[in-house]
């Protein structure tokens, strides 16, 4: 391996960058790399990601205009998680599995959130078939009443029963909210990956259709709030059987007509 290791992140989300955040340390500790650089071809949805994830990483030496390989995949092998797969794809292997993302930052605590349940309804990347109604029903079943909710943005699943709205002003502020809450509940998106990087277990909600490779952290409790019931499974199988039988019937009739 070259003594310079370059990282490029093509997808600009918070979680997308954190999926690569363990690589600089591994490259220097286990990969025999002298210098780690972040490609300027990387995409950022927010400038805070570059500053807090990469510029604050002690194993990152700077930035470069050079390109670097970027993995494309929709699943990971058993016994590994998403971060392991990226590590191995990039030619590194420290022998460990189920890596957690890294953030070299210690957030300040917010006293008013101590002992509170905080719900973040926002997401950018796909979280599966999930809507506000599914969250409300799940909270009602589990007798969960959030004390605070983050202010809803463009995409999300807000609930009606909440206390004061919190509007995060920066990535550091968001980290402080996660670190200060007694219980943090979010969707299985960037917030869950950020919490893993902070070493904080959360309840991460998702729905059918989300790729399970995004359930990457052993710290978290990943909850499907819109599970397919046994009746729905049976109905789906019955529909498929009926469609197959219909196609066979049409084929049989066509054969008779063509004789």
Summary of predicted features, one role per range:
Residues 1-259:
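Catalytic machinery of carbohydrate-active enzymes
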């Amino acid at each position: 391996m070259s003594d310079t290791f370059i990282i490029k992140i093509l997808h600009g989300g918070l979680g997308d960058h954190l999926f690569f955040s363990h690589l600089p340390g591994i490259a220097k500790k286990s990969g025999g790399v002298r210098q780690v650089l972040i490609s300027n071809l990387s995409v950022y949805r927010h400038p805070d990601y570059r500053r807090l994830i990469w510029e604050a990483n002690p194993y990152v030496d700077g930035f470069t205009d050079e390109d670097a390989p970027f993995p494309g995949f929709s699943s990971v092998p058993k016994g590994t998680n998403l971060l392991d797969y990226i590590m191995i794809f990039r030619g590194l292997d420290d022998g460990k599995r189920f890596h957690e993302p890294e953030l070299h930052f210690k957030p300040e605590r917010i006293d008013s959130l101590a002992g509170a349940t905080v719900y973040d309804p926002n997401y950018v990347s796909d979280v599966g078939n999930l809507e506000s109604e599914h969250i409300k029903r799940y909270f009602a079943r589990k007798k969960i009443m959030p004390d605070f909710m983050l202010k809803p943005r463009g995409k999300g699943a807000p609930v009606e029963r909440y206390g004061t709205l919190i509007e995060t002003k920066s990535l550091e502020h968001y980290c402080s909210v996660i670190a200060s809450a007694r219980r943090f509940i979010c969707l299985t998106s960037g917030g869950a990956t950020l919490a893993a990087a902070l070493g904080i277990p959360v309840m991460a909600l998702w729905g059918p259709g989300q790729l399970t490779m995004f359930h990457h952290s052993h710290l978290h409790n990943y909850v499907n709030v819109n599970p397919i019931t046994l009746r729905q499974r049976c109905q789906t199988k019955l529909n498929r059987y009926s469609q197959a039988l219909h196609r066979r019937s049409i084929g049989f009739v066509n054969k008779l007509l063509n004789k």
